[in-house]
Amino acid sequence: MNPHDLEWLNRIGERKDIMLAVLLLAVVFMMVLPLPPLVLDILIAVNMTISVVLLMIAIYINSPLQFSAFPAVLLVTTLFRLALSVSTTRMILLQADAGQIVYTFGNFVVGGNFIVGIVIFLIITIVQFLVITKGSERVAEVSARFSLDAMPGKQMSIDGDMRAGVIDVNEARERRATIEKESQMFGSMDGAMKFVKGDAIAGLIIIFVNILGGVTIGVTQKGLAAAEALQLYSILTVGDGMVSQVPALLIAITAGIIVTRVSSEDSSDLGSDIGKQVVAQPKAMLIGGVLLLLFGLIPGFPTVTFLILALLVGCGGYMLSRKQSRNDEANQDLQSLLTSGSGAPAARTKAKTSGANKGRLGEQEAFAMTVPLLIDVDSSQQEALEAIALNDELVRVRRALYLDLGVPFPGIHLRFNEGMGEGEYLISLQEVPVARGELKAGYLLVRESVSQLELLGIPYEKGEHLLPDQETFWVSVEYEERLEKSQLEFFSHSQVLTWHLSHVLREYAEDFIGIQETRYLLEQMEGGYGELIKEVQRIVPLQRMTEILQRLVGEDISIRNMRSILEAMVEWGQKEKDVVQLTEYIRSSLKRYICYKYANGNNILPAYLFDQEVEEKIRSGVRQTSAGSYLALDPAVTESLLEQVRKTIGDLSQIQSKPVLIVSMDIRRYVRKLIESEYYGLPVLSYQELTQQINIQPLGRVCL
């Protein structure tokens, strides 16, 4: 074949749309025009080839979505097969000849016996119709329904992963497209299985019509005896039916494989999946070998055959069991190697890479980013911490904090570490510990006062100060029922972790708002507030926007109301270039939320106030530079101010209603920085952040 011919074939292969159109037109002409036997043989061979190729594709695809065009292919192949049946029927009735393949199927395959042919044809048709097609149709129907019902949950899961930073926007878009494609695929398969079902029914009808029509034509028009006509036309009709039903059966098997395929991330072809899952159960093979041996001992059964099978299955199970045991021992040795030592991230990474890169020490190490959020727990607590309950608690905490602050916190990594003290746990941000605590085996954590526990006669042990202004106590689990009856709040080990973690996340929330997260929040709003997003990006650079959001969440102000925040940025962004002051204007635009948050839904706000002289002293200490503003008070003045704050406010943990501190807007941020080391939980508000409906309940005034 010369290069010109190859180029011509390549051009034809590139125009797949034209090839499909030609095929569909050919199907129509096959129903109308009579075809010679040679052409029929070619078309029948093509039909068989298509069915075999489709079956092989179904076996080797990793997921049904890799052959999402199959419903349309099923329609085309069904039409092609029916058109072929019409053409062969025409040739059988007109010329008593439908080509060499039909004749061979009628004589050689069924031995020229009409009864045998009918029986084989009926068996194939019944298997296809009642077994394969019926089951595949039901599976497709259920898959379509479940796929549609699961779409909202999958979409929410994708959104959660994207907020947590597990995936980026592009991957989230791809996953959503995959879910939509999967739903359409199974919905189409639900309808396409009706083609296979109808094809089987049509095959049954066609064969009986052909026999009846052939005998009638043979007797009335060709002068044949009834028995002779029946023998001639029935053999050809059975051959035609077999030629049609064998590819139809292969197509039905293909459809069944595709709709019943359960795909996962580590899926490969069907044979590999079946092989891996079968050999993963060596005990089942050993038991199967014993059962086969017992079958061989039954009188009358072929003993040698069953003994050989029992030997093969049993030996296979034994060898797989030995191999699995060796792998488990190797994994345990590797795990003990990785978990020994201090458990520090650097040491652990070194252990892993030294084993993986043995003999390749000269190669460059792969870049590994730090884990954003990590909980290290003493390995002895692994059984006490129920995995499912802990996972539910962690998901609940992330969800609650997102609804409260609007911060897309990342996924939480839990690691059991043998190098830690008994019951100890560490909470780390970017693999740097920021909080620690202890879990006491057989005890519950209680936050109630000592007097309540003593009143109930419950013995206790004083726990650590997990939070600055909260005392905790350990109570034995045997008093759990008494605590429940007394309606005293207590925490299990899983709840202690999540409770402590929630406070840590709230304290360090601003660390989880970066440029990437800010970009994500803007992209989430583009669909409904496109013009607002364009305007705010024109006025406020992304870096300044990020800093503003960090300052808001750093003081426990939710950023879920992004529309109001962005509107305020547009309003004040051109007038005010100082990020600190711009944040104050944005806070004033959130006054309804702030008042509702700190007044607990009431119109009365318990508050401490600063004397005018104190405010002037702070105002005089503010310094403006090109890099921004800061508070520069004399150390003696700073200590004097803090001492007056301590005298006025005292111990916040002893105050039932949570108060706030109210100062002027221009010094609010500096006052917050001044007192946050000692009064982190005391919100500092400005008068501009109060609505008209709020009534201030003064609790005290800080004076010099």
From Swiss-Prot:
The chain crosses the membrane at residues 20-40, 42-62, 67-87, 112-132, 200-220, 238-258, 290-310. PROSITE patterns: FHIPEP. It holds the Pfam family FHIPEP. GO terms for biological process: protein secretion. InterPro entries: FHIPEP_1, FHIPEP_3, FHIPEP_4, FHIPEP_CS, T3SS_FHIPEP, T3SS_HrcV. It is a multi-pass membrane protein. The keyword Oxidoreductase does not apply. Keywords: Cell inner membrane, Cell membrane, Membrane, Plasmid, Protein transport, Transmembrane, Transmembrane helix, Transport, Virulence. One of its GO terms (cellular component) is plasma membrane. It comes from the Bacteria. It is found in: Cell inner membrane. Belongs to the FHIPEP (flagella/HR/invasion proteins export pore) family. Could be involved in the secretion of the yop virulence proteins. This is Low calcium response locus protein D.
